[in-house]
Amino acid sequence: MKRLEYPFREEDVRGLVAGEPVVVSGLVRTGRDRFHKYFADGGRIPVDFRDGALFHCGPVVVKRDGAWKVVAAGPTTSVRENPYEPDFIRESGVRLIIGKGGMDGATLAACAKHGCVYLQAVGGAAALTAACVKEARGVHFLEEWGAAEACWEFDMDSFPCVVAMDSHGTSLFESVAEASLDALARLR
């Protein structure tokens, strides 16, 4: 299993293929609906995503003894970000998009053009993902958007994912759908 460490280098990302399991370690930032809309509307994102990771996640986070503790951090459905993701990939230089359920052809094309991949995280395992968060380093837009929509900065350790859309234009979701249709046709 390949280990991806922040900063995520383009040459490493371009070496990944759809279907390959990976673990992600280092800085991973969250962003979901409010984040993407804010970006699309020209809002200033206060962090640099170049060679970084964006996790579609609305975590449950509590403050204990003056520090943030991540209780749950499951992926949220990525398809909602389809209208925004190609531009975000192009403009930010992000290398990893992490979520669940896949994204559209425009995002796949942006991944291929700009050296990015879409990683499928395990849905329904928010406690498992939270256990991979060593530290919540910081948070942006907490007061404005609330904890679930805020942009969190997590220090992750061995976060398991699968390359679902690679930088060569291959989508695991499309491959599985095609194989399923072929199998169905053979049954008829």
Task: Label the predicted regions.
Residues M1-F8:
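Short, structured beta-strand/loop micro-motifs enriched in basic residues and often containing a Trp
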Residues R3, V23, L54, V162-A164:
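Structured core elements
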Residues E10-G15:
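Short, surface-exposed secondary-structure edge patches
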Residues T30-F159:
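Feature captures the catalytic cores and cofactor-binding loops of soluble hydro-lyases/lyases
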Residues E85-D87, V163-R188:
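Active-site/ligand-binding-proximal alpha/beta "capping" segment
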